[in-house]
């Protein structure tokens, strides 16, 4: 059985190397990542069961450890590797974003923030810190809360702006409900942070709300924020 499993693994790798990674199905791609099975199941069988259990690659990437381990033959090692691969992708996206001389590509910025925040189970509040040419200094996740709220304080944000010598920033947070519309609380904290930043001559460029499939720009939809 193990000989057959090994041959199957080699076939998948050969297919990838010969025809390119895009030639593999989702299950085959996951099987290459899993790499090896056990004496009862091949990597392809494990990939099939995991996909059947969780539905799709996005759900697999965002699954918690217990859901992942519910498939016999998959454990903490593979889960840790999967989370590391996911983070590598996020950091690669950030490198692409940093290549911009100036942060002028709004859609690229939205796409990065959406990919980074959309799948968190709890509301998470983040910021892109920029220099006076709107080049990215850092991306940081500053506050995390419950499924429907995160407590946000302007003071730590201002302190971080001063530490990084940032001249501007873009705020972003997710709505785990999937809805991207800004709440009254979102508008209020945006105004409080903008006013706090004014005291240190830093400019708030936007506050982006991330839903499941859409993003909402508080500044684009609420002209008061640009005054």
Curated annotation (Swiss-Prot):
It comes from the Bacteria. InterPro entries: MPN, RadC_JAB, RuvA_2-like, UPF0758, UPF0758_CS, UPF0758_N. Keywords: Hydrolase, Metal-binding, Metalloprotease, Protease, Zinc. It comes from Legionella pneumophila (strain Lens). CDD domains: MPN_DUF2466. The keyword Metal-binding applies. Zn(2+) binds at residues 173, 175, 186. Residues 102-225 form the MPN domain. Transmembrane segments: none annotated. A motif (JAMM motif) lies at residues 173-186. This is UPF0758 protein lpl2409. GO terms for biological process: proteolysis.
């Amino acid at each position: 059985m193990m000989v057959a499993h090994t041959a199957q693994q080699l076939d998948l790798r050969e297919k990838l190397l010969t025809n390119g990674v895009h030639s593999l199905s989702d299950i085959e791609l996951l099987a290459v990542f899993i790499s090896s099975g056990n004496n009862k199941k091949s990597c392809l069988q494990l990939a099939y069961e995991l996909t059947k259990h969780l539905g799709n690659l996005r759900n697999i990437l965002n699954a918690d450890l217990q859901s992942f381990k519910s498939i016999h033959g998959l454990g903490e090692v593979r889960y840790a590797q999967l989370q590391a691969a996911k983070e590598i992708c996020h950091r690669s996206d950030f490198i692409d974003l940093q290549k911009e001389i100036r942060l002028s590509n709004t859609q690229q910025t939205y796409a990065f923030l959406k990919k980074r925040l959309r799948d968190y189970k709890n509301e998470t509040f983040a910021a892109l810190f920029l220099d006076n040419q709107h080049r990215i200094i850092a991306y940081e996740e500053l506050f995390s809360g419950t499924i429907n709220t995160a407590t946000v304080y302007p003071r730590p944000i201002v302190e971080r702006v001063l530490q990084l010598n940032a001249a501007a920033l873009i705020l972003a947070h997710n709505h785990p409900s999937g809805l991207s519309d800004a709440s009254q609380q979102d508008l209020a904290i945006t105004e409080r942070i903008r006013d706090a930043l004014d005291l240190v001559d830093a400019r708030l460029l936007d506050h982006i709300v991330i839903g499941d499939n859409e993003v909402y720009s508080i500044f684009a939809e609420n002209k008061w924020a640009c005054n």
